[in-house]
């Protein structure tokens, strides 16, 4: 099913028992985080806080708190079908012309989907039903203060829209935003992210000139999830959202700039970043489970707030996994696999364990074809997609290992690895500045673990053979297993 806006999606979730309305007065200061966290841990529903303390605007939390709801938001039945989206992205990243008539017929569905990529530009839109310009105050937003040590309320689910001076496509990214004053927030974007790259190019091309920015809150689920999906750099997240939705993304021009924002967003913040204006951001509790260091980031000055009537404020919290970002990571893991397999066909599975903060550790299983193959795959993971430049640990195993089963992975590490021979250490590589374990902010090391069976060129030892029972014996025991009644006998004895 496809959804025109966030409200369509919420109506479906409520009909399926996947949305809970909270009628009691709940404080955005800490209380919403605690309720959302307990609900997420229990794989509970999305939450709509109808009476946030001190505010009239309802707050939506835990929207993507299960992988099932992530799949639903992408218009899919369940998480298993997300690999089809990955196959589509792999095709868009490196499209291949049809090799013949049959191949053309097989590719027609992809070509038809591409027709949904261009934006549909509206002259008026629900997101501009109400306009605040004079004496605007960001305090009208029920922004959550998530953790006791946080310095200020935080806008967490804003889709930041930017455009570089030499680019036609607009970039959508999600960056946390500290509320600084009535009309200013801090834009915490890392140097490699699309918004930061657009801003850097703008400063070079238009020195001293304000950089237009817009932030959309409460867009439709396809647009929200399009902003966190690894789309090719040349493709706009709006275009990919159209593919997800099955029809073109509706946008409207900002009041203060030429940027286009989701027409059905609940709230839009318009404004600019004045080059050189920065402020100290943090500390905040983040997805690692720790409070991060403070650092200076650009300041976004808000000139307009536009919104729908009876707008809904979309929010979340981040903390030690599992949290909502880690659930998103687990779902998007399925999207990454076909993209990696197109470049490295030997990859069988790829897994980012949520407890590894969604991206800091990856387990890869491969069909090994030559000595040193595992190291090539490590290098490929670190370099092929920008999303993995901050992955600190890559474990490569053979395809007889289940990448998603720690018992299998640990067994492979402890039986197939020599620490000196099979550990690859690389120093002075890009690291998330939130990673306080690195010796220098933004720069640290990476480790690759080759837990594959070694070929003759890689060892002088006779390699071990895995133990496996004869099939005939297994068949014989299968035939008499129920007759043995072993477990029922044990339960009778325990009584």
From Swiss-Prot:
Mn(2+) binds at residues 171, 237. Its cofactor is prenylated FMN; Mn(2+). GO terms for biological process: ubiquinone biosynthetic process. It comes from the Bacteria. Keywords: Cell membrane, Decarboxylase, Flavoprotein, FMN, Lyase, Manganese, Membrane, Metal-binding, Ubiquinone biosynthesis. Binds 1 prenylated FMN per subunit. It is a peripheral membrane protein. It catalyses: a 4-hydroxy-3-(all-trans-polyprenyl)benzoate + H(+) = a 2-(all-trans-polyprenyl)phenol + CO2. Pathway: Cofactor biosynthesis; ubiquinone biosynthesis. Prenylated FMN binds at residues 174-176, 188-190, 193-194. One of its GO terms (molecular function) is 3-octaprenyl-4-hydroxybenzoate carboxy-lyase activity. GO terms for cellular component: cytosol; plasma membrane. This is 3-octaprenyl-4-hydroxybenzoate carboxy-lyase. It comes from Hamiltonella defensa subsp. Acyrthosiphon pisum (strain 5AT). The lineage of its organism: Bacteria, Pseudomonadati, Pseudomonadota, Gammaproteobacteria, Enterobacterales. The gene is ubiD.
């Amino acid at each position: 099913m496809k959804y025109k806006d966030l409200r369509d999606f919420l109506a479906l979730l409520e009909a399926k028992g996947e949305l809970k309305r909270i009628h009691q007065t709940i404080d955005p200061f800490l209380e919403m985080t605690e309720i959302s966290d307990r609900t997420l841990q229990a794989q509970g529903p999305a939450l709509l806080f109808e009476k946030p303390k001190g505010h009239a605007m309802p707050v939506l939390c835990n929207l993507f708190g299960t992988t099932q709801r992530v799949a639903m938001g992408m218009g899919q039945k369940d998480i298993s079908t997300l690999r089809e989206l990955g196959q589509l992205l792999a095709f868009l990243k490196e499209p291949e012309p049809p090799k013949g008539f049959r191949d053309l017929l097989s590719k027609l569905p992809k070509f038809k989907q591409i027709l949904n990529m261009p934006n549909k530009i509206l002259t008026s839109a629900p997101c501009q039903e109400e306009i605040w310009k004079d004496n605007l105050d960001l305090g009208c937003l029920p922004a959550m203060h998530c953790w006791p040590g946080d310095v200020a309320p935080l806008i967490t689910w804003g889709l930041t829209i930017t455009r570089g001076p030499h680019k036609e496509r607009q970039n959508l990214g999600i960056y946390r935003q500290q509320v600084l004053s009535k009309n200013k927030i801090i834009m915490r974007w890392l140097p490699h992210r699309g918004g930061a790259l657009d801003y850097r190019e703008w400063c070079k091309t238009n020195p001293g000139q304000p950089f237009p920015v817009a932030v959309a809150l409460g867009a439709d689920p396809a647009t929200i999830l399009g902003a966190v999906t690894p789309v090719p750099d040349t493709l706009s997240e709006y275009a990919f959202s159209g593919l997800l939705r099955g029809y073109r993304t509706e946008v409207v021009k900002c009041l203060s700039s030429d940027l286009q924002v989701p027409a059905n967003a609940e709230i839009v913040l318009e404004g600019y970043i004045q080059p050189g204006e920065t402020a100290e951001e943090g500390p905040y509790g983040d997805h690692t489970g720790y409070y991060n260091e403070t650092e200076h980031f650009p300041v976004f000055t808000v000139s307009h707030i536009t919104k729908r009537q009876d707008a809904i404020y979309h929010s979340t919290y981040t903390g030690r996994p599992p949290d909502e970002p880690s659930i998103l990571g687990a779902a998007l893991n399925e999207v990454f696999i076909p993209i990696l397999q197109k470049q490295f066909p030997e990859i069988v599975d790829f897994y980012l364990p949520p407890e590894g903060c969604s991206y800091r550790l990856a387990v890869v299983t491969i069909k090994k074809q030559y000595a040193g193959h595992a190291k090539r795959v490590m290098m490929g993971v670190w370099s092929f997609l920008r999303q993995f430049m901050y992955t600190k640990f890559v474990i490569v195993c053979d395809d007889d290992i289940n990448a998603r089963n720690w018992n299998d992975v640990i067994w492979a590490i402890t039986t197939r690895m020599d620490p000196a021979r099979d550990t690859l250490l690389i120093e002075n590589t890009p690291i998330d500045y939130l990673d306080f374990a690195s010796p220098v902010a933004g720069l640290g090391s990476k480790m690759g673990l080759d837990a594959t069976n070694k070929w003759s060129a890689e060892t002088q030892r006779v390699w071990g053979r895995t133990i496996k029972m004869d099939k005939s014996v297994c068949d014989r025991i299968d035939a008499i297993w129920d007759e043995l009644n072993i477990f029922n006998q044990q339960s009778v004895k325990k009584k």
